[in-house]
Curated annotation (Swiss-Prot):
Similarity comment: In the N-terminal section; belongs to the methyltransferase superfamily. tRNA (mnm(5)s(2)U34)-methyltransferase family.
Protein name (Swiss-Prot/TrEMBL): tRNA 5-methylaminomethyl-2-thiouridine biosynthesis bifunctional protein MnmC
Cofactor(s) required, per the database record: FAD
Subcellular location: Cytoplasm
UniProt function note: Catalyzes the last two steps in the biosynthesis of 5-methylaminomethyl-2-thiouridine (mnm(5)s(2)U) at the wobble position (U34) in tRNA. Catalyzes the FAD-dependent demodification of cmnm(5)s(2)U34 to nm(5)s(2)U34, followed by the transfer of a methyl group from S-adenosyl-L-methionine to nm(5)s(2)U34, to form mnm(5)s(2)U34.
InterPro entries according to UniProt: FAD-dep_OxRdtase, FAD/NAD-bd_sf, MnmC-like_methylTransf, SAM-dependent_MTases_sf, tRNA_MAMT_biosynth_bifunc_MnmC, tRNA_MNMC2, tRNA_S-uridine_synth_MnmC_C
The keyword Nucleus appears for this protein: no
Organism, scientific name: Shigella flexneri serotype 5b (strain 8401)
Key word Flavoprotein present: yes
Gene transcribed to yield this protein: mnmC
């Protein structure tokens, strides 16, 4: 069975207060002066003090084996802050640190270890505040207002490096080869790891490690590094340093799912919802010039305009990609929303998903069998539901203690205001009619004979995504739905968590003393007119799921308060994030893909045209991480997701899966 939680570090603290691994019988850092050793071995061994001011790019990428207590990272972060303060006009503006950890510390142990270095406290406290729960895969932490990015990959480094997306190939400027001593942890120090380090290192990339073991030096030389010995720190006689003097072009591992970025840094985003807003922030943080074109007179008038939306992960025991995306997207979303410097109505009150019938009970039982961390999800028995949620349902279920609700409309509006303060240009009442290539740019034709030219375009306009010739064949569909707004009652006012059943019910929003109950589902419809049938059905589904609950029968929808919206969805429930694929060229180039995979060319796409769509009903959960994924791709930066999950987000995936099996593909 696949496990979705990671085993935490098994450690104790010795007489000096130094953490020691019980499993590896080794210290996490030197008893003498771990901080100075880090500065000498890793910062000095990679010559970072000299390289930072001379770096010709805005981003410096460092990768590390073994995050441990984060001492190396915190020391580096402090040094980077000092560099930026001393060289504010330098080309280098941002730091990206990638680290792998098989047995992450608990937050409590991390905080205890950090007490050793009071001079690192300002940085350590920020790390502790965002420390992720023990889920496998990549956890992206945005620190110092996005100037420092930390990618924590939880799992075995030798397994994870084989699962990385090609976006990391030849991107690493410096390697910190750390971890428990080779004699204590031989399973990590393998030729497989050394080869992966070489693959990820950019030309001129360096490495440093505390060990001088001969097999390590020979293995790194075999991988392609030029190695040399250097005086070790303190009582250690020698350590190793290396450089990747030259690299060869690397073939794409799965060219049919290849992701291409852009060398340009000027973009038009089409849309006005949460996808557009969050992508704008992610691109602005990377130095892009961003313009946004919204068809409406104001933002969040489409699917992002609801008063309350639930935030919790979409999990399925039988869908690996779904679990990888939504479990890590959920934790990223919580960190992201918590540090946003804008106001929006929200309450992280928890979400309880109830088993109201045999089918839903079976689904919940399968989710609970996935060995999920308790911070993510826990079982709740029927007799405990009332205590947790505040209302009686006579149903058992699964609780997401870090879930809750937020106001999507307010979030979208205020994020766009924040983005405007950072340079975003917004054009309202610009309905895009079509777009075409002109002189290596995109010519945008809007209703009313308005035109604009942009280097790069992102289509993030929800269910209208398929209205252009470049996207008309995409396998997406519209879903119209109505959310009912109901006044609170004394019984409903007791509701403490979001309830999910064959619908959902939110606790009251203190701003308006109303709850949201929804939502109707009409696949293939774009009708946004109020429906009395939908209003009554929203109420009836609640009553049908909890027939013994008197409070459910007292729900009042008679005032006809509701909001109707249209979502964009796919049949596999995953967003479409990446290059807009060229349908006709895909069919031609991949006509014999099943027999000629070794000869496949890179996925046919429209140059400098991207899409961010099909968020379905879980956009509040997936949008923050997907915005980060797309912005990283467009900027040719490391992506915070493994290759197979990125393939599951590729807009061409449904076509390619059929072509790989030798099956015919139809448009739409």
């Amino acid at each position: 069975m696949k496990h979705y939680s990671i085993q935490p570090a098994n450690l104790e603290f010795n007489a000096e207060g130094t953490p020691v691994s019980r499993d590896f019988d080794d210290v996490y850092f030197s008893n003498d002066n771990g901080l100075e050793e880090t500065r000498y071995v890793f910062l000095g061994g990679n010559q970072l003090e000299v390289r930072f001011p001379e770096h010709p790019h805005p981003l410096f990428v460092i990768a590390e084996s073994g995050f441990g207590t984060g001492l190396n990272f915190l020391t580096l972060w402090k040094a980077f802050d000092q560099f930026r303060e001393a060289h504010p006009q330098a080309q280098l503006q941002r730091l990206h640190f990638i680290s792998f950890e098989k047995f992450p510390l608990t937050r409590a142990d991390l905080a205890l270890a950090h007490q050793h270095w009071p001079e690192l406290a300002p940085w350590a406290e920020q790390l502790q505040a965002q420390w992720p729960m023990p889920l496998p895969g990549c956890h992206r932490l945005l620190l110092d207002e996005g100037r420092v990015t930390l990618d924590l990959w939880f799992g075995d480094i030798n397994e994870l490096t084989s699962q990385l997306d090609d976006s990391l190939n030849q991107k690493v400027d410096a390697w910190f080869l750390d971890g428990f001593a080779p004699a204590k942890n031989p399973d990590m120090w393998t030729q497989n790891l050394f080869n992966a380090m070489a693959r990820l290192a950019r030309p001129g990339g360096t490495l440093a490690t505390f060990t001088s073991a001969g097999f390590v030096r020979r293995g790194l030389q075999e991988a392609g590094f030029t190695m040399q010995k250097r005086k070790g720190f303190g009582r250690k006689r020698e350590m190793l340093c290396g450089v990747m003097e030259q690299t060869l072009p690397l073939p794409c591992s799965t060219p049919w799912f290849n992701r291409t970025g852009s060398s340009k840094r000027e973009v038009a985003i089409i849309g006005g919802g949460i996808a557009s807003a969050l992508l704008s922030l992610a691109l602005l943080r990377r130095g892009w010039q961003v313009a946004l074109y919204c068809a409406d007179e104001a933002p969040a008038l489409g699917a992002s305009g609801n008063r309350q939306g639930a935030l919790y992960p979409l999990l399925s025991k039988h869908d690996e990609a779904l679990n990888r995306l939504f479990s890590n997207a959920f934790t990223f979303a919580r960190r992201f929303y918590d540090q946003l410097p804008v106001k929006f109505d929200h309450d992280w009150c928890g979400v309880t998903q109830l088993g109201w019938d045999e089918k839903s009970q079976h689904k919940i039982a399968q989710m609970l069998s996935m060995d999920l961390p308790a911070e993510l999800a826990v079982a709740v028995e029927a007799n405990a539901v009332e205590q947790i949620t505040g209302v009686a349902t006579n149903c058992s279920g699964i609780t997401y203690p870090q879930g809750g609700w937020l106001c999507p409309a307010e979030l979208t509006r205020n994020v766009l205001e924040l983005a405007q303060q950072q340079g975003l240009q917004i054009y309202y009442q610009y309905q895009l009619q079509n777009l075409s290539r002109k002189d290596d740019c995109w010519l945008l034709n809007f209703a009313g004979d308005q035109q604009a030219t942009h280097s790069v375009v992102v289509l993030a306009n929800g269910h209208q995504i398929s209205r252009f010739s470049q996207t008309s064949t995409l396998p997406v569909y519209s879903v119209a739905g109505q959310v009912s707004h109901i006044p609170t009652t004394p019984e409903l006012a007791e509701l403490k968590q979001v309830l999910c059943y064959d619908g959902y019910l939110t606790p009251q929003n203190p701003a308006n003393q109303h709850h949201c109950i929804g939502a109707s589902y009409h696949r293939g419809s774009e009708d946004t007119a109020y429906s009395e049938d939908d209003q009554q059905q929203n109420r009836q589904r609640l009553i049908d799921c909890f027939p013994q609950a008197q409070w459910a029968k007292e729900v009042d929808v008679s005032d006809k308060e509701a909001r109707c919206g249209v979502r964009c969805a796919t049949r596999d429930h995953l967003p479409m994030v990446g290059n807009v694929p060229d349908y006709e060229a895909t069919l031609v180039e991949y006509a014999s893909l099943a027999e000629q995979k070794d000869e496949a060319v890179s996925a046919p796409v429209f140059d400098d045209l991207f899409m961010f769509a099909a968020l379905g009903s879980r956009g509040l959960c997936s949008a923050p991480l997907c915005a980060e994924i797309l912005a990283a791709q467009m900027s040719d930066e490391p992506n915070p997701m493994d290759a197979s999950t990125l393939a599951a987000l590729n807009p061409n995936r449904l076509w390619v899966r059929k072509l790989l099996k030798g099956k015919a593909v139809k448009a739409g």
